[in-house]
UniProtKB/Swiss-Prot annotation:
This is Small ribosomal subunit protein uS10. SUPFAM superfamilies: Ribosomal protein S10. Keywords: Ribonucleoprotein, Ribosomal protein. Belongs to the universal ribosomal protein uS10 family. The keyword Ubl conjugation does not apply. GO terms for molecular function: structural constituent of ribosome; tRNA binding. InterPro entries: Ribosomal_uS10, Ribosomal_uS10_CS, Ribosomal_uS10_dom, Ribosomal_uS10_dom_sf. GO terms for biological process: translation. Involved in the binding of tRNA to the ribosomes. Pfam families: Ribosomal_S10 (PF00338). It comes from Clostridium perfringens (strain 13 / Type A). One of its GO terms (cellular component) is ribosome.
Length: 102
């Protein structure tokens, strides 16, 4: 598995859980001897939803809600089989979406 890299993208609504998960992945990869690049913060997606407060009229009275999706990118360069096994056994919180590309 030399001269390869593993690219890990993390997504979450809560940035504190996301940063803790990224730190767990980085220290797990470093403990197995792989070189780690990141975590690199990617742009935050902000979805804004506007609804009317009243049911029938008063269009000037609106309320806005937003959902922010925070993202991080981690590259693991020259991973060993030991690194891949350690990453597969890693327990991360339920609010974090993980996308791994080899």
């Amino acid at each position: 598995m030399s001269k390869q890299k593993i690219r890990i993208r993390l997504k979450a609504f809560d940035h504190t859980i996301l940063d803790q998960s990224a730190e767990k992945i980085v220290e797990t990869a470093k403990s197995t001897g792989a070189k780690v690049v990141g975590p690199v913060p990617l742009p935050t997606e902000k979805d804004v939803i506007t609804i009317l407060r009243a049911v029938h009229k008063y269009k000037d009275s609106r309320e806005q809600f937003e959902v922010r999706t925070h993202k991080r990118l981690i590259d693991i360069v020259n991973p060993s089989p030991k690194t891949v096994d350690a990453l597969m056994r890693l327990n991360l919180p339920a609010g974090v979406d993980i996308e791994i590309k080899l």
